[in-house]
Amino acid sequence: DTYLKTLPPLRSKSDQKSLWDGLMDGTIDIIASDHNPMDIESKRCEFGKAEFGTATIENSFGWYRAKKANQRALDRWVEAVAHNPRKLFNLKDCSIDIGNYADLTIFANDGSLIEKKTLGANVPNWNQNGRAIGIINNKKIIQL
């Protein structure tokens, strides 16, 4: 299945469990994604000829929620994808306050919302529980 051709490659169940354990016990500080959406032609071909990649930014939260939905796991996930990368790169903390410009991602909790801009984003048989639907940054609202 060319939708599953990613780099780095998808890992075994044992590796996935180790990653979750590392996130929960603090061994893993930061989670990043290689957001690399592909067009139809790049994925509708033989596996060996298919390009590596899939859209991950708007899907990663839904994939996460389909697997781990408790509050502690959510707090650790948000810390690893949002707060800790900002600390690493010495970026200021974001806060929602009167007079501040918003800098945030908007998520929808309802189902998989499978409207996609590329076929690479539509990875078959991966359950989702919501996804990012937009961002607010620099006084602009961007719908995904």
What are these regions (language model features)?
Residues 1-31:
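Histidine/acidic residue-rich metal-binding segments in metalloenzymes
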Residues 6, 10, 47, 123:
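Short clusters of hydrophobic/aromatic residues that line enzyme substrate/ligand-binding pockets
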Residues 9-11, 15, 52, 119, ...:
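Short capping/connector residues at structural and topological boundaries
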Residues 12-21, 60-66, 131-139:
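Short C-terminal domain-edge/linker segments immediately following a structured domain
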Residues 15-19, 92-93, 122:
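A generic local structural motif
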Residues 22-107:
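His/Asp/Glu-enriched, well-ordered alpha-helical/loop segment
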Residues 49, 101-144:
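C-terminal cap of metal-dependent C-N hydrolases
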